[in-house]
């Protein structure tokens, strides 16, 4: 089995590509073994470093991709040197592609392991993964970096069971100790309330996401996963902090850990350093307890791969790498992702890119990434809002509005039967008229209700924003006067 081979490999480890290696063609330095999947911005491959025989992950990115985001990801990885953060080895330009060489994590992502085993994790397994993840976050936060997309799909496991943070496609850096960001960025169900509200946030936004991730590992999905992401975006800031569906099934220490992560006021939320001293984390067992998870997931992956190969005709076998889902969570061709701004979702096999599985739930769990045109949030300073109140519209609302315009509402078949705004709810509650409609007409009416609901929610939000904006401006004005004194 591959995990055993990697553990027993006596060769020396690759730390960084030499100048000589970087001046060669990548094919002279690496043997590309197989395609792992489609990641954020490009394809991810498993490869072997010829000199050391070390397995690495190579992300191949077309140069027409969003180079600004790619350069940001490389910059973040270059600056990091932690056993709990995926390592960066070097980059190449090959024809029209940029090759990014990074650490390969043979265990895959935590979400992949849950999916392959069709089983959630127990408390001992969760505590061990959280301990390593918190060490990675402690390191990033000490370096004044915010990950901004913590979830099970972005936590990778090495063959030994070490958890590592990956996918820095949306990571950002704080350039001032008091700086806070105010861009909606991350994955909707894992977003901290202050991120959604765009009131500025700092490193503890990652701690909220970690609490949601802990629930995800325990229950298989994050809170609000069953509902539309837009509804979740309104519910997360207004509702009490989420918790387990059945808290009585979990230990008091685990429930307390979740409660400390999911404090709505970021000023009162615990830091990664503080949480590493929590009893639930301090009681974590060694990484060896995760090996059975890795072996079980690897066995299941091999079974599925063999089954897939038996089903494929000989002339189609060359396409297995592109069609195979179980070597990682793969991007679905022509996917139906209507709810994500920039799909950076699930990672696989140590590839520091994002893999998206094609099940229904994952289509709603991609990463929402909204940046200002001039990227001024990268200065680390909070942006002042100077626009009139009636023009204020959170970025995520603009995004969903664009999606609605893109996919449109059902076309009219009659002047009165399909436009939801023209359909008045019967005051007497009598819906017997529906019996005279065809199935197609009823289905069309049903399909038209969601856009109608979203428009009404947006109108309500505009009214709220119109009341909220003068208060925010008054607070900002008072702060400026205090600074002048």
Curated annotation (Swiss-Prot):
List of residues that carry Phosphothreonine: 183
SARAH domain boundaries: 431-478
Subunit structure: Homodimer; mediated via the coiled-coil region.
Domain Protein kinase: 30-281
GO biological process, one term: positive regulation of apoptotic process
Record's function text: Stress-activated, pro-apoptotic kinase which, following caspase-cleavage, enters the nucleus and induces chromatin condensation followed by internucleosomal DNA fragmentation. Key component of the Hippo signaling pathway which plays a pivotal role in organ size control and tumor suppression by restricting proliferation and promoting apoptosis.
Compartment(s) of residence: Cytoplasm; Nucleus
Enzyme Commission code(s) on record: 2.7.11.1
Any GO CC annotation of this UniProt entry: nucleus
Annotated positions for site Cleavage: 326-327
CDD domains listed in its UniProt record: SARAH_MST1, STKc_MST1_2
Ligand binding (ATP): 36-44, 59
Catalytic residues, chain numbering: 149 (proton acceptor)
Main location: cytoplasm
Alphabetized UniProt keyword annotations: Apoptosis, ATP-binding, Coiled coil, Cytoplasm, Kinase, Magnesium, Metal-binding, Nucleotide-binding, Nucleus, Phosphoprotein, Serine/threonine-protein kinase, Transferase
Pfam families: Mst1_SARAH, Pkinase
SUPFAM superfamilies: Protein kinase-like (PK-like)
Source organism: Xenopus laevis
Catalysis performed (reactions): L-seryl-[protein] + ATP = O-phospho-L-seryl-[protein] + ADP + H(+); L-threonyl-[protein] + ATP = O-phospho-L-threonyl-[protein] + ADP + H(+)
Protein's name in the database: Serine/threonine-protein kinase 4
Gene for this chain: stk4
GO molecular function per UniProt: ATP binding; metal ion binding; protein serine kinase activity; protein serine/threonine kinase activity
Top-level EC class: transferase
Cofactors: Mg(2+)
Lineage top rank: taxon: Eukaryota
PANTHER family named in the record: STERILE20-LIKE KINASE, ISOFORM B, STERILE20-LIKE KINASE, ISOFORM B-RELATED
PTM: Autophosphorylated on Thr-183.
């Amino acid at each position: 089995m591959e995990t055993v081979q990697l553990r027993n490999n006596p060769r020396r480890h690759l730390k960084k590509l030499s100048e000589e290696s970087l001046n060669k063609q990548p094919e002279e330095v690496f043997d590309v073994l197989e395609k792992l999947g489609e990641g954020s911005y490009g394809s991810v491959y498993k490869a072997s470093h010829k000199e050391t025989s070390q397995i690495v992950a190579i992300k191949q990115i077309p140069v027409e991709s969003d180079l600004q985001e790619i350069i940001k990801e490389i910059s973040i990885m270059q600056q990091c040197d932690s056993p709990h953060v995926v390592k960066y080895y070097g980059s190449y330009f090959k024809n029209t592609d940029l090759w990014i060489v990074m650490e390969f994590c043979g265990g895959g992502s935590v979400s992949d392991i849950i999916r392959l085993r069709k089983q959630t994790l127990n408390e001992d397994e969760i505590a061990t993964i959280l301990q390593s993840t918190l060490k990675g976050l402690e390191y990033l936060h000490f370096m004044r970096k915010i990950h901004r997309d913590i979830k099970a799909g972005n936590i990778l496991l090495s063959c030994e069971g070490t958890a590592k943070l990956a996918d820095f496609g949306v990571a950002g850096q704080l350039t001032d100790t008091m700086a806070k960001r105010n861009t909606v960025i991350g994955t909707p169900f894992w977003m901290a309330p202050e991120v959604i509200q765009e009131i500025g946030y700092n490193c503890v936004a990652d701690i909220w996401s970690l609490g949601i991730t802990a629930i995800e590992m325990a229950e298989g999905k994050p809170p609000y996963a069953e509902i539309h992401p837009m509804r979740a975006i309104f519910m997360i800031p207004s509702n009490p902090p989420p918790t387990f569906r059945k808290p009585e099934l979990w230990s008091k220490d685990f429930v307390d850990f979740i409660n400390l992560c999911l404090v709505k006021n970021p000023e009162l939320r615990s830091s990664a350093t503080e949480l590493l001293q929590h009893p639930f984390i301090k009681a974590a067992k060694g990484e060896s307890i995760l090996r059975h998870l890795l072996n079980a997931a690897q066995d299941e992956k091999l079974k599925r791969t063999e089954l897939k190969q038996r089903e494929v005709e000989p002339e189609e076998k060359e396409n297995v790498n592109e069609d195979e889902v179980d070597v990682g969570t793969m991007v679905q061709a022509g996917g139906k992702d209507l709810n994500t701004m920039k799909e950076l979702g699930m990672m696989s096999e140590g590839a520091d890119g994002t893999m998206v599985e094609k099940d229904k739930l994952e289509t709603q769990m991609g990463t929402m990434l909204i940046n200002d045109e001039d990227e001024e949030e990268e200065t680390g300073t909070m942006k002042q809002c100077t626009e009139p109140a009636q023009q204020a519209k959170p970025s995520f609302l603009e995004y969903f509005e664009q999606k609605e315009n893109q996919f449109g509402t059902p076309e009219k078949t009659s002047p009165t039967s399909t436009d939801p705004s023209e359909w008045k709810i019967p005051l007497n509650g009598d819906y017997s008229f529906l019996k005279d409609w065809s199935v197609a007409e009823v289905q069309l009416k049903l399909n038209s209700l969601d856009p109608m609901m979203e428009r009404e929610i947006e109108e309500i939000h505009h009214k709220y924003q119109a009341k909220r904006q003068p208060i925010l401006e008054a607070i900002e004005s008072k702060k400026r006067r205090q600074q002048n004194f």
